[in-house]
From Swiss-Prot:
The gene is fliW. This is Flagellar assembly factor FliW. It holds the Pfam family FliW. It is found in: Cytoplasm. Belongs to the FliW family. Its main location: cytoplasm.
Amino acid sequence: MKLETKCHGIIEYKEEDVIEFKKGIPGFNELKRFINFPIEDNEVFSVLHSIENNEIGFIVTSPFSIIKDYEINLDDSVIERLNIENEKDVLVLNTVTLHSKLENITVNLCAPIVINIKTKLGEQIILNNGKYQIKHPLFKEGI
């Protein structure tokens, strides 16, 4: 199948690549089906893109590339909704907010996107532990 995206051109994918967000993503509750694909020549970022709206995609990254000891504790209800049986089947991503100035690019560490790569079910959860920032700077000034 092909998805013609606004910013990334035509992306080919298979039905088994589709990740279902039964609750949608906050702010985009009506969009339930997404694919995650790498950004060309970039190992840090990828795109989580709606296949229902070719204009909606999010730049995402692994929180572990930013904070090595990043941790989340999933409620039993999330584990059940995503049918998680093994933590090795879990992919955690965080949304990135782009800006023209490098030092203003941020990542939302408070609301990780949790994906069961085995069942292709996903959900964005909110961490209320006060440990992480919504707008965590991705780059330090002067880099």
